[in-house]
Amino acid sequence: ISPQEAMLRADGRTLLVVVDTNRPEQVEDADLLMACNRVAVIDHHRVAATYIHNAALGFIEPYASSVGELMTEVLQEVVDQNDILRCEAEALLSGIVLDTKSFTIRTGERTFDAAAYLRRAGADTTDVKKLLQTDMDDTVAKYKILQSAKLYRDLAIAVPEEPQNRVVAASAADEL
């Protein structure tokens, strides 16, 4: 649902679950974060200096490859594998594939165990690959960012000429 719809539905019993970040400035909607009294944070990044302070639950595991890996481990403990929908398994597997660059970085035994579990739950790797494909406009935008990169003290720095969506910007940053 949209942040606006979530804001309309939120009440005193609402639990807002924030995934893949623990920084309030990176959430989809800061107003929604502030409006919810109960917040859970599930993340695989190190705790930032500006972490979400009002979290009732913090599941932050920097040694995990991805939030997909963490959530798969949770699912294995609380849900019967047959109850996981194929689209859910594919969404989790796509997160693992994306964050590990197709299992080439930040992987460990837990990563592969999670992927195997999701395959058994019905995730199709061909469909996962399709989920991760970008359209031509996003590809062009990414390569414009890469083309603008400059080296400074052995670091590549790129500043897009136009505002980009976060997925395109993150993809370009991964390439640098």
Residue ranges and their predicted role:
Residues 8-11, 31-34, 51-52, 84-86, ...:
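Solvent-exposed alpha-helices and their adjacent loops that cap or buttress functional pockets
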Residues 15-17, 38-42, 57-60, 156:
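Hydrophobic/aromatic beta-strand patches that form the interior of the parallel beta-sheet core
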Residues 1, 5-15, 98-176:
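Hydrophobic helix-and-loop "lid/oligomerization" segment in the mid-to-C-terminal part
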Residues 44-114:
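Short alpha-helices
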Residues 1-35:
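N-terminal small/polar loop signature for handling phosphorylated ligands or for N-terminal nucleophile
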Residues 31-37, 114-117:
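Catalytic-core regions built around general acid/base machinery
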Residues 26-28, 50, 105-106, 167:
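Short helix/loop capping segments that flank catalytic or ligand/cofactor-binding pockets
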